């Protein structure tokens, strides 16, 4: 049975022997191993691929991270650039704002400067300013606000009107001696004052006063003159005429020259030598005759105590071509200096004042060489030398407008008038003549007010400036009454003289308006220049006579 079962098993197994079975199994396992190896290789390949892919992914991630970093850097740079741009824009805007503020301030400053320059052109009377400044001022806008400066009047009228103060002349009851027939105390409208102009207040002698007594004025110098040439010339001339009385050496210590005005101040080493130099008036210097005078600050009272005030009679003037007694015309012991004259006084008015004491032998109202305007002082000599001291005593110290007259002998200390000169008749004549002068210079009320020394000829030449001044005058003058007419004479383009240039005439409907205007305007400043307001004769104004 067992054998049968074994045989059956062998049949089941294919009827092959056992050894054959093992060989067959080995043959089948090899391909399987190869397949497994191949699978393993594939797995390894897949792992490598995965690793490679993961590596690539990591590289890509790194690249992406780098890109993100770069993007962040770019964003950061863009933010910085944007911030920088905004900051720069903000700074530019702030700079523009500051610049605009600066421009506005500068514009306001420029406007103030233009207003100030407009005042300056009326205040500064040197006449040497360039026309280019005038062009700049004229280019300002005509539409500027009037609230800044209503008119050229730069100050309000004072609480008490500054009106011209005329001399207080004594009444006949104050004169020594008996009363004058026909003279009454109420004859003059002027106040009563003490008549004592002869009192001279003593002053301490100073070195400055000594220096002034040693200086002489030399005018009319040629353009080629300089300090050295003037000093050498006067040293030689003083030695030639025997004027070096202080001993050997040069008489001239110092020379100051004003080249624009062509004059010099020559300082001598002694008062006596300065007095000797006065004899050289009219001498030729480099072919031109020169004037030799005392300076305006010369004080004869102090100088008289320092030494001779007149040239020595022993000078040899013929040695330098001069004739004794001929120099100067107005020179001499009776020559009178009249200082403190109001600038608006004409030559005729000054003559009228001086001739109230008698006819004049010589008269010279000193004027500016460039403008022709009065400098406020004059010299005169009377035909009758006996009235010299009377005139000095009567006129010295009196008020004329806003000025006080200084009247004295020009070349020596003040002398006391002789008793026979102090006649009551002459003093009465003085009262009458001064009263007449007061009415002449504008004390009698009229409908016309004249403002003097208000504008210059240069300002009136330009049409726009002229209209500005005219507008200012209308605005201001119209405040005080019914203003009928404003007249401002202008220079002639051809250079011909025109009467009244520098004056402003205001015509009112009645005397009351003119009086208010005169009271309010007198003493104020127009363009920095003091205004002098006087009444003007209506008949002369209506006939266009503007030089009265």
Curated annotation (Swiss-Prot):
Residues 1-156 are annotated as: Disordered. Signal peptide: none annotated. Gene3D superfamilies: 3.30.70.330. The keyword Cytoplasm does not apply. The keyword Nucleus applies. Keywords: mRNA processing, mRNA splicing, Nucleus, Repeat, RNA-binding. Residues 1-82, 94-120 have a biased composition (Basic and acidic residues). Residues 214-297, 334-412, 453-539 form the RRM domain. It is found in: Nucleus. GO terms for biological process: spliceosomal complex assembly. Residues 83-93, 121-149 have a biased composition (Basic residues). PROSITE patterns: RRM. GO terms for molecular function: poly-pyrimidine tract binding; pre-mRNA 3'-splice site binding. One of its GO terms (cellular component) is U2AF complex. Pfam families: RRM_1 (PF00076). Belongs to the splicing factor SR family. Necessary for the splicing of pre-mRNA. PANTHER family: RNA-BINDING PROTEIN (PTHR23139). N-terminal RS domain has a very strong bias in favor of D over S. This is Splicing factor U2af large subunit B.
């Amino acid at each position: 049975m067992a054998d049968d079962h074994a045989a059956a098993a062998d049949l089941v197994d294919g009827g092959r022997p056992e050894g054959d079975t093992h060989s067959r199994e080995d043959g089948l396992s090899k391909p399987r191993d190869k397949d497994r190896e191949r699978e393993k290789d594939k797995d390894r390949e897949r792992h490598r691929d995965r690793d490679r892919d993961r590596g690539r992914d990591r590289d890509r991630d790194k690249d992406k991270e780098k890109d993100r970093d770069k993007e962040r850097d770019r964003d950061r740079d863009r933010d910085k650039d944007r911030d920088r741009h905004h900051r720069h824009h903000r700074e530019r805007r702030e700079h523009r704002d500051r610049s605009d503020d600066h421009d506005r301030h500068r514009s306001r400053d420029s406007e103030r400067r233009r207003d100030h320059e407009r005042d300056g052109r009326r205040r500064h009377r040197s006449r040497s300013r360039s026309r280019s400044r005038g062009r700049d001022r004229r280019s300002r806008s005509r539409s500027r606000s009037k609230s800044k400066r209503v008119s050229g009047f730069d100050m309000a009228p004072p609480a008490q009107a500054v009106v011209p103060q005329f001399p207080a002349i004594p009444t006949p009851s104050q004169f020594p001696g008996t009363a004058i027939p026909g003279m009454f105390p109420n004859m003059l409208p002027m106040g009563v004052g003490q008549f004592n102009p002869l009192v001279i207040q003593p002053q301490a002698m100073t070195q400055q006063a000594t220096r002034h007594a040693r200086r002489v004025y030399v005018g009319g110098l040629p353009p080629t003159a300089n300090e050295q040439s003037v000093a050498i010339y006067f040293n030689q001339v003083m030695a030639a005429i025997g004027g070096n009385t202080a001993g050997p050496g040069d008489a001239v210590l110092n020379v100051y020259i004003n080249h624009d005005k062509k004059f010099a101040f020559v300082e001598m080493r002694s008062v006596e030598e300065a007095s000797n130099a006065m004899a050289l008036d009219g001498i030729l210097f480099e072919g031109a005759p020169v004037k030799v005078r005392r300076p305006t600050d010369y004080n004869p009272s102090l100088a008289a105590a320092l030494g001779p005030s007149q040239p020595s009679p022993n000078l040899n003037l013929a040695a330098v071509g001069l004739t004794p007694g001929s120099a100067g015309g107005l020179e001499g012991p009776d020559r009178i200096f009249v200082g403190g004259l109001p600038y608006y006084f004409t030559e005729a008015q000054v003559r009228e004042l001086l001739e109230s004491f008698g006819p004049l032998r010589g008269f010279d109202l000193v004027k500016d060489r460039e403008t022709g305007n009065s400098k406020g002082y004059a010299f005169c000599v009377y035909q009758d030398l006996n009235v010299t001291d009377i005139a000095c005593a009567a006129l010295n110290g009196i008020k004329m407008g806003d000025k006080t007259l200084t009247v004295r002998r020009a070349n020596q200390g003040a002398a006391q008038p002789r008793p026979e000169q102090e006649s009551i008749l002459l003093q009465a004549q003085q009262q009458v003549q001064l009263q007449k002068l007061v009415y002449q210079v504008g004390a009698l009320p009229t409908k016309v007010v004249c403002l003097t020394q208000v504008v210059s000829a240069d300002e009136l030449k330009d049409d726009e400036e002229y209209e500005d001044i005219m507008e200012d005058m209308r605005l201001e003058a119209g405040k005080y009454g019914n203003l009928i007419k404003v007249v401002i004479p202008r220079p002639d383009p051809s250079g011909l003289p025109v009467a009244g240039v520098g004056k402003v005439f205001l015509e009112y409907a009645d005397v009351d308006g003119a009086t208010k205007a005169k009271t309010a305007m007198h003493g104020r400043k127009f363009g920095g220049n003091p205004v002098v307001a006087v009444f003007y004769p209506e008949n002369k104004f209506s006939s266009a006579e503007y030089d009265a």
